[in-house]
UniProtKB/Swiss-Prot annotation:
Family of the protein in this entry: Belongs to the glycosyl hydrolase 10 (cellulase F) family.
Comment on activity versus temperature: Optimum temperature is 60 degrees Celsius, more than 80% of activity remains after 1 hour at 60 degrees Celsius.
Keyword Mitochondrion set for record: no
Secretion signal, residue range per the UniProt entry: 1-33
Gene3D superfamilies in UniProt: 2.60.40.290, Glycosidases
InterPro entries: CBD2 (IPR001919), CBM2/CBM3_carb-bd_dom_sf (IPR008965), CBM2_carb-bd_dom_sf (IPR012291), GH10 (IPR044846), GH10_dom (IPR001000), Glycoside_hydrolase_SF (IPR017853)
Pfam families: CBM_2 (PF00553), Glyco_hydro_10 (PF00331)
Residues forming the catalytic site: 166, 271
pH effect on activity, per entry: Optimum pH is 6.5, more than 80% active between pH 5.0 and 7.0.
Protein's recorded name: Endo-1,4-beta-xylanase A
High-level lineage: Bacteria, Bacillati, Actinomycetota, Actinomycetes, Kitasatosporales
Organism: Streptomyces sp
EC number: 3.2.1.8
Length: 464
C-alpha cells in the first residue's frame, strides 16, 4: 500500500495529455463505459435504501466545471470537503481564521440536500509554518483553540468530523508529528475532547489509511479506540480511507470493519479509490469492478458501517496520477464523465446483489491433481456479459463414493450428493467478462461432473 499524499493532487497538463494519449491508444481493449445507460436510481439513493450514504469528496478548483458539479449534485448523498477545511486554509496565521473556501462547498452541498463531512482538524500535513514554531508549552492550547473555533463555526452543518488524521506509522507506532513531539500521546484524546465540547452532536472520527485490513497499524488504532471507549473519550467512529490497488482488496476487510464496530463505534470508508497500472484494459476494468463491489458488500454486511465516500468520483480530478506515475483510472467515472464498469458494480452491490439485466455466469470444473482415494478440483466462475454481476451460486452432483473434505473461496452446502457453493462476499462481484475461482479437496475417484451450473445473484434473504 502507500502513504497518503498531503494534497488530493491534480495532474499537470503534460501528465494529463500523456494519460489521455495512452488511454486513446488502448481504447479498443477497454470495456464499454456505458455513457448512455439509464440507471434506475443514483448511488446515493441506492445507499439510502440500505440505510447508508454514498458520497464523493470535492475541491474548490473543480466547482466551475458545470458537467462535474451536475453529477456531483445529483448522484451522491454526501460530500467531503477535500482540502479547504485543513489548517493551512482555515487558520493561515495564528488567530486569523478564514472559512470562505470551505463554506463554498458546504453551501453547495446544502443546496443539493447533501450531508457534509468535515476533513480534517488535526493532521501532520498541510499545516501553516507558524504551527511548527509554537513553543511546546503552548501547542496544546493552540490546538484546542483551533479545533474549538472551526468546529463551532460549522456547528449544526456537518454530520461527521475527521478530528485527527493519520497519526500512526505502518508498524503501529505513533507518527512523530509536531503534536506528538511537543504534546505527547495525549494529544489525540485532547483533540476529541475539544471537538465534543464545541459541538455535542456531530460524529467524531479518527481517520487513517492502510487500516482497512488487519495488521500492525490497524491493530494499534483498534487498541487506541478500545482504550478511548473504556476511558469515556468521545470518539464516535473510525474512518478507513481505502486508497486501494486493483486486485489487492484486503481479505480481512469485512472482519476488520466488524471488529471496530464491535467496540461500539461506527465505521465509514472515507476516501475510496482503486487504482490500476495504465493503460486501462477490459481485464483491469473487470478486476476494478469486482473490487469496488467487494468493498461495498463488506460495508453492507456490517450494520455500523454507515457509508462510503469516493475520493472524488471522476478520473479527471483524481489525485493518483500526480503521485503514482503510470497509475490511475482509480474512480467509477472516466475522464469524460462516462460510467465505468466499477460504477455498475457499485450499483449492483448497493441494489442487493441483483444481477445486471442480461447478466449470466458460467462454471468450468477442472481436476487439478489426483491420487489413490482423493483429488483436488478448481472451478472457475465467469461472467459472460459486459455488465457486472453480484453474487453467484454453483451446483453439481457428486459421483457415488465422492465427498468434499475441505473447500476454499466458497461457502459450501452438501445435501446428500447435491453440492451448492455460493460466493464468500469478497469474490462475489464479477465485472464484465470477469472471473474468479474456488476449489476443494475431495475423497473418492476424480471425475468431471456433467451437470455443473452457475446462477448469478444471491437468493432472497441471504448474504455473503
Amino acid at each position: 500500500m502507500f502513504r497518503h499524499h498531503p494534497t488530493r493532487g491534480r495532474r499537470t497538463a503534460g501528465l494529463l495529455a500523456a494519460a489521455l494519449a495512452t488511454l486513446s491508444a488502448g481504447l479498443t481493449a477497454v470495456a464499454p463505459a456505458h455513457p448512455a445507460r439509464a440507471d434506475t436510481a443514483t448511488l446515493g439513493e441506492l445507499a439510502e435504501a440500505k440505510g447508508r450514504y454514498f458520497g464523493s469528496a470535492t475541491d474548490n478548483p473543480e466547482l466551475p466545471d458545470t458537467q462535474y458539479t451536475q453529477i456531483l449534485g445529483s448522484e451522491f448523498s454526501q460530500i467531503t470537503v477535500g482540502n479547504t477545511m485543513k489548517w493551512q486554509y482555515t487558520e493561515p496565521s495564528r488567530g486569523r481564521f478564514d472559512y470562505t473556501a470551505a463554506e463554498e462547498i458546504v453551501d453547495l452541498a446544502e443546496s443539493n440536500g447533501q450531508s457534509v463531512r468535515g476533513h480534517t482538524l488535526v493532521w501532520h500535513n498541510q499545516l501553516p509554518s507558524w504551527v511548527d514554531d509554537v513553543p511546546a508549552g503552548e501547542l496544546l492550547g493552540v490546538m484546542r483553540d483551533h479545533i474549538t473555533h472551526e468546529v463551532d463555526h460549522f456547528k449544526g452543518r456537518l454530520i461527521h468530523w475527521d478530528v485527527v488524521n493519520e497519526a500512526f506509522e505502518e508498524d503501529g507506532s505513533r507518527r512523530q508529528s509536531v503534536f506528538q513531539q511537543k504534546i505527547g500521546d495525549s494529544y489525540i484524546a485532547e483533540a476529541f475532547k475539544a471537538a465534543r465540547a464545541a459541538d455535542p452532536d456531530v460524529k467524531l472520527y479518527y481517520n487513517d489509511y492502510n487500516i482497512e485490513g488487519i495488521g500492525p497499524k490497524s491493530d494499534a488504532v483498534y487498541e487506541m479506540v478500545k482504550s478511548f471507549k473504556a476511558q469515556g473519550i468521545p470518539i464516535d467512529g473510525v474512518g478507513m480511507q481505502a486508497h486501494l490497488i486493483a486486485g489487492q482488496v484486503p481479505a480481512s476487510l469485512q472482519e476488520n470493519i466488524r471488529r471496530f464496530a464491535d467496540l461500539g463505534v461506527d465505521v465509514a470508508l472515507t476516501e475510496l479509490d482503486i487504482r490500476m497500472t495504465l493503460p486501462r484494459t477490459a481485464a483491469k476494468d473487470a478486476q476494478q469492478a469486482t473490487d469496488y463491489g467487494a468493498v461495498v458488500e463488506a460495508c453492507l454486511v456490517v450494520s455500523r458501517c454507515v457509508g462510503i465516500t469516493v475520493w472524488d468520483y471522476t478520473d479527471k480530478y483524481s489525485w493518483v496520477p500526480s503521485v503514482f506515475p503510470g497509475q490511475g483510472a482509480a474512480l467509477p467515472w472516466d475522464e469524460d464523465f462516462a460510467k465505468k464498469p466499477a460504477y455498475h458494480a457499485i450499483a449492483a452491490a448497493l441494489n442487493g446483489g441483483s444481477p445486471a439485466p442480461g447478466g449470466n455466469c458460467t462454471a468450468t470444473y477442472r481436476v487439478t491433481s489426483q491420487w489413490q482415494g482423493g483429488f483436488t478440483a478448481e472451478i472457475t466462475v465467469g461472467n459472460d456479459h459486459t455488465a457486472p454481476i453480484t453474487g453467484w451460486t454453483v451446483t453439481w452432483t457428486l459421483s457415488s463414493g465422492q465427498s468434499i473434505s475441505h473447500m476454499w473461496n466458497g461457502n459450501l452446502t452438501v445435501n446428500g450428493q447435491d453440492v451448492t457453493v455460493r460466493d464468500v462476499g469478497y469474490n462475489g462481484t464479477l465485472g464484465g467478462n470477469g472471473s474468479t475461482t474456488f476449489g476443494f479437496q475431495g475423497e473418492g475417484v476424480a471425475d468431471t461432473p456433467a451437470d455443473v451450473t452457475c446462477t448469478p445473484g444471491r437468493p432472497s434473504g441471504t448474504s455473503a
